[in-house]
């Protein structure tokens, strides 16, 4: 059975303030709960005039108080900027406030360009620790299972909770899928960034191949979805069918979105780089057409959980898209 969740970045609409947008996010979470969506994800972006969602760990607390039962998740915390212990404590606290409803999604990206990254990491020693090392440490903190000889074996995130947050890694590559699988944590493939089905196919295979025996970790897919009463109405929301990735000489990879955003990012880059153009995973059409494509992806890649990303700034049109999708896929569950 297909299960749907929502990823909301809190995109600021025409003529809106950031405060207006955040209230739209709250209302969208409430609608998602009523329509039968399983989980509501909120994102982290920095120094972006078009996005209000900069602190998911704060927004989740407000959403937990504004809803009753829907699961809530960060999509995701940009772990490279933070102490893994502090992140674990934040999500343990959220889990104490909303038991069984909180999940911790983390991302490898910076969530912004170099200026915001420099500000967020100003107190860090250089070079910053490798992401995989921090992710493994975070996983041990949340699970409370450091080896006895580890320097943090006696350190526990407070408050202690009976129902710990689930951990997810968000990414768009086979490499990230393998990193998640080896740790036995769930993986969300960012299809809305990398819509190459060959990459999806290989990431799915690699995730299964590297998962420890008995692990309950899952592989989720996050497509961009636009549903409307007609295919033409849905497709008017598509700004581009490609995304740009910048690969720096030191191995860092930054998804920058559009060509215009790539140009802005590269203004502050002094080292050699390569640019990779990726097809985005966009599904647009009537509710029946969208449901048909989700069913195809589910059957082809054995995926039951979809994280639906609908980057429409107009709150009414965005909500309509999610309502139509729920009518086509989730109505029988309500």
From Swiss-Prot:
Disulphides: none
Enzyme Commission number(s): 1.14.14.-
Catalyzed reactions per annotation: N-acetyl-S-benzyl-L-cysteine + FMNH2 + O2 = (R)-N-acetyl-S-benzyl-L-cysteine sulfoxide + FMN + H2O + H(+); N-acetyl-S-methyl-L-cysteine + FMNH2 + O2 = (R)-N-acetyl-S-methyl-L-cysteine sulfoxide + FMN + H2O + H(+)
Pathway: Amino-acid metabolism
Keyword entries, A-Z: Flavoprotein, FMN, Monooxygenase, Oxidoreductase
GO molecular function list: monooxygenase activity; oxidoreductase activity, acting on paired donors, with incorporation or reduction of molecular oxygen
Domain of life: Bacteria
Pfam families: Bac_luciferase (PF00296)
Role noted for this protein: Involved in a cysteine salvage pathway from S-alkylcysteine. Catalyzes the oxidation of N-acetyl-S-benzyl-L-cysteine and N-acetyl-S-methyl-L-cysteine to (R)-N-acetyl-S-benzyl-L-cysteine sulfoxide and (R)-N-acetyl-S-methyl-L-cysteine sulfoxide, respectively. This pathway is likely important in the catabolism of alkylated cysteine generated by proteolysis of alkylated glutathione formed in the detoxification of a wide range of electrophiles.
Family: To bacterial alkanal monooxygenase alpha and beta chains.
Protein name: N-acetyl-S-alkylcysteine monooxygenase
Species: Bacillus subtilis (strain 168)
Gene: cmoO
């Amino acid at each position: 059975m297909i299960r749907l969740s929502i990823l909301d970045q809190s995109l600021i609409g025409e003529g809106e303030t950031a405060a207006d947008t955040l209230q739209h996010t709250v209302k969208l979470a409430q609608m998602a709960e009523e329509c039968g969506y399983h989980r509501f994800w909120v994102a982290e972006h920095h120094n972006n005039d078009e996005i209000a969602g900069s602190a998911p760990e704060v927004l989740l607390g407000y959403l937990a108080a504004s809803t009753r039962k829907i699961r809530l998740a960060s999509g995701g915390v940009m772990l490279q900027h933070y102490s893994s212990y502090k992140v674990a404590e934040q999500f343990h606290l959220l889990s104490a406030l909303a038991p069984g409803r909180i999940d911790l999604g983390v991302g490898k990206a910076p969530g912004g360009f170099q200026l915001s990254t420099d500000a967020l990491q100003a107190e860090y020693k250089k070079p910053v620790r490798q992401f995989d090392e921090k992710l493994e440490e975070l996983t041990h903190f949340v699970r409370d299972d450091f080896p006895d000889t580890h320097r943090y074996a006696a350190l526990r995130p407070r408050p202690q909770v009976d129902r710990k947050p689930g951990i997810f890694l968000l990414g768009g590559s086979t490499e990230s899928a393998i990193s998640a699988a080896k740790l036995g944590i769930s993986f969300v493939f960012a299809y809305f960034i990398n819509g190459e089905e060959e990459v999806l196919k290989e990431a799915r295979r690699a995730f299964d191949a590297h998962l420890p025996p008995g692990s309950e970790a899952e592989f989720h897919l996050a497509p961009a979805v636009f549903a409307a009463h007609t295919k033409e109405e849905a497709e008017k929301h598509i700004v581009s069918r490609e995304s740009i990735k910048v690969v720096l000489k030191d191995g860092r990879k930054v998804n920058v979105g559009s060509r215009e955003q790539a140009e802005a990012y590269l203004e502050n880059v002094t080292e050699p780089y390569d640019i990779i153009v990726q097809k985005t995973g966009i599904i647009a059409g009537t509710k029946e057409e969208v449901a048909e494509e989700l069913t195809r992806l589910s059957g082809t890649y054995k995926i039951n959980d979809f994280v639906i990303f609908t980057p429409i700034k107009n709150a009414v049109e965005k909500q309509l898209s999610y309502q139509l999708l729920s009518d086509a896929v989730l109505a029988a569950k309500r």
